[in-house]
């Protein structure tokens, strides 16, 4: 049995810079990896069937991103091999920590290796772009500035930092948050994150998320005495930068 780590991420800054004609929002964001992981256990059976189970029953269906990624990889390469995949879910669902995207990216990387497909990382990123906006970042395996709808990835070097991350046991629908987010309420619809030595703080989705889930605003208020509180992705996880490992 092969074991693969699927890391979580934080958005240190997230700005919405526009919207495409097809409805997809454009973003400019700083992504960083954190030491929270899902675990993928994968073995290659003699038959060509794809099998998947998880510790979270609500994601055990055929529409799971891991199965979608495996099917897309087989379709792209013509591979006929199967896989048995078990996911030990440690990253909370609907938290803005990128767990589902990371799982899919890790599956692509793992199966590319286990099936001996030898696709280059750039080819996997192209494939990942068709599956979800955050998945290409996790293929890149490096802290990055991410733009567009997630397909423009520029690796960056960040200083070593520690974060206290709180999951308030609230599951957020990213689709719902974006559907309620309106650029018409923004004073400037073409904002771009400035040079990395002068990032803005904050998250353009926070106000919308707090309106939809007002309990998160209360949680943030409780955390503020301990430092500057930020939200990752569309929520619900909040984080504070701290000086040392707790």
What are these regions (language model features)?
Residues 86-115, 133, 228-242:
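Glycine/serine-rich anion-binding loops at beta->alpha junctions
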Residues 1-95, 113, 117-122, 149, ...:
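ATP-binding N-lobe of GHMP and related small-molecule kinases
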Residues 46-59, 107, 129, 194-203:
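Short, basic/glycine-rich phosphate-binding loops at helix/coil junctions
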Residues 12, 40-42, 66, 100, ...:
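Residue-level signal for inorganic ion chemistry
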Residues 50, 138-228, 241-245:
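Conserved, helical-rich catalytic subdomain that frames metal- and/or nucleotide-binding sites
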Residues 104, 108-145:
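Contiguous, small/hydrophobic- and glycine-enriched helical/loop subdomains that border
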Residues 38-42, 134-138, 144-145, 238-240:
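Short beta-strand scaffold segments in enzyme catalytic cores
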Residues 2-3, 244-246:
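Conserved glycine-rich phosphate/nucleotide-binding loop
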């Amino acid at each position: 049995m092969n074991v693969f780590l699927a890391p979580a991420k934080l958005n240190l800054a997230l700005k919405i810079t526009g919207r495409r004609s097809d409805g997809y929002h454009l973003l400019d964001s700083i992504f960083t990896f954190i030491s929270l992981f899902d675990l993928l256990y994968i073995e290659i059976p003699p038959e060509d069937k794809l099998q998947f189970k998880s510790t979270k029953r609500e994601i055990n269906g055929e529409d799971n991103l891991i199965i979608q990624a495996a099917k897309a990889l087989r379709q792209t390469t013509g591979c006929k091999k199967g896989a048995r995949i078990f996911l030990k879910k440690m990253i909370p669902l609907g938290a803005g920590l990128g767990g589902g995207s990371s799982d899919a990216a890790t599956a692509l990387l793992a199966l590319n290796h286990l099936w001996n497909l030898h696709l280059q990382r750039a080819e996997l990123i192209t494939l990942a772009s068709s599956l979800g906006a955050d998945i290409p970042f996790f293929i890149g395996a490096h802290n990055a500035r991410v733009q567009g709808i997630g397909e423009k990835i520029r690796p960056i070097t960040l200083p070593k930092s520690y974060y206290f991350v709180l999951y308030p046991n609230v599951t957020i629908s990213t689709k719902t948050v974006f559907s309620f987010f309106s650029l018409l309420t923004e004073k400037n619809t073409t904002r771009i994150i400035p040079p990395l030595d002068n990032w803005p703080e904050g998250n353009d989705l926070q106000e919308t998320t707090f309106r939809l889930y007002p309990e998160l605003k209360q949680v943030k208020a409780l955390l503020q005495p301990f430092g500057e509180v930020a939200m990752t992705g569309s929520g619900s996880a909040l984080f504070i930068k701290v000086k040392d490992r707790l």
